[in-house]
Amino acid sequence: MSMLPSFGFTQEQVACVCEVLQQGGNLERLGRFLWSLPACDHLHKNESVLKAKAVVAFHRGNFRELYKILESHQFSPHNHPKLQQLWLKAHYVEAEKLRGRPLGAVGKYRVRRKFPLPRTIWDGEETSYCFKEKSRGVLREWYAHNPYPSPREKRELAEATGLTTTQVSNWFKNRRQRDRAAEAKERENTENNNSSSNKQNQLSPLEGGKPLMSSSEEEFSPPQSPDQNSVLLLQGNMGHARSSNYSLPGLTASQPSHGLQTHQHQLQDSLLGPLTSSLVDLGS
């Protein structure tokens, strides 16, 4: 462990200071410390120093410098999650500034597809919703066995997958909601199919036949004989004659009603007189 020339700290001590300042959130102080480091290639290629520079570049909004650091050096796998977050968040911020609005889930997905993680901070394994496929496989296998893991089982799954307990809980909750929605949709489709089949099986009236029921009053009235029709027609005509101003031949509209009755009696006498005489002659 050799001291750096004209600095007074070893390389290991510099790395330790960088880690402590990062964990404490003292990013401005970390930036000043990095600026004070001597121009030593061996020191500036230290992974802890490079990671500290990336954190400070993101904090100051210097995304171009951040991308340059992340793409130019191969980092250890244990540093990948932190550096991947910096890469994605920086691209999200730039996209939001261009669009003038926050990104939704679809917008973030498009950004990830447009700016994939560099292989310097990614092991090449496909991720889904920020979960590695290996982790999702473990969760799917457990879900098939038990969709409702206990708190202790969730902690064990978190340790096995490298996720947090909250992430594990949310994954199971979302998976149960998707399955319930799929089951409800399937039941709805089955009920609709059964309803359609029942309607097709119902009997329908024969084509061209008389309807079983009719709202017309004529359908509920018995058929009338020709004699009845004649009587009704005659009665209707007589009623119409009484109610109207129609005048019989030889009478004027100004004649009183008793004149009409007298004329009717005269007609009856003229018609019945000869008939009566004929009957008397036949009887004698």
UniProtKB/Swiss-Prot annotation:
Domain of life (superkingdom): Eukaryota
One GO cellular component term: cytoplasm
UniProt biased composition (Polar residues): 242-269
PROSITE patterns from the UniProt entry: HOMEOBOX_1 (PS00027), HOMEOBOX_2 (PS50071)
Keywords (A to Z) from UniProt: Activator, Apoptosis, Cytoplasm, Deafness, Developmental protein, Disease variant, DNA-binding, Homeobox, Non-syndromic deafness, Nucleus, Phosphoprotein, Repressor, Transcription, Transcription regulation, Ubl conjugation
Region (Disordered): 168-269
DNA-binding region, residues: 124-183
Cell compartments where the protein resides: Nucleus; Cytoplasm
Pfam families: Homeobox_KN, SIX1_SD
GO terms, biological process: aorta morphogenesis; apoptotic process; branching involved in ureteric bud morphogenesis; cellular response to 3,3',5-triiodo-L-thyronine; cochlea morphogenesis; embryonic cranial skeleton morphogenesis; embryonic skeletal system morphogenesis; endothelin receptor signaling pathway
Post-translational modification: Phosphorylated during interphase; becomes hyperphosphorylated during mitosis. Hyperphosphorylation impairs binding to promoter elements.
Tissue: Specifically expressed in skeletal muscle.
GO molecular function: chromatin binding; DNA binding; DNA-binding transcription activator activity, RNA polymerase II-specific; DNA-binding transcription factor activity; DNA-binding transcription factor activity, RNA polymerase II-specific; RNA polymerase II cis-regulatory region sequence-specific DNA binding; sequence-specific DNA binding; sequence-specific double-stranded DNA binding
Illness association: Deafness, autosomal dominant, 23: A form of non-syndromic deafness characterized by prelingual, bilateral, symmetric hearing loss with a conductive component present in some but not all patients.
Subunit structure comment from the entry: Interacts with DACH1. Interacts with EYA1. Interacts with EYA2. Interacts with CDH1. Interacts with TBX18. Interacts with CEBPA. Interacts with CEBPB. Interacts with EBF2.
Function: Transcription factor that is involved in the regulation of cell proliferation, apoptosis and embryonic development. Plays an important role in the development of several organs, including kidney, muscle and inner ear. Depending on context, functions as a transcriptional repressor or activator. Lacks an activation domain, and requires interaction with EYA family members for transcription activation. Mediates nuclear translocation of EYA1 and EYA2. Binds the 5'-TCA[AG][AG]TTNC-3' motif present in the MEF3 element in the MYOG promoter and CIDEA enhancer.
Name the UniProt record assigns to this protein: Homeobox protein SIX1
UniProt organism field: Homo sapiens (Human)
Organism taxonomic ancestry: Eukaryota, Metazoa, Chordata, Craniata, Vertebrata
Gene name for this UniProt entry: SIX1
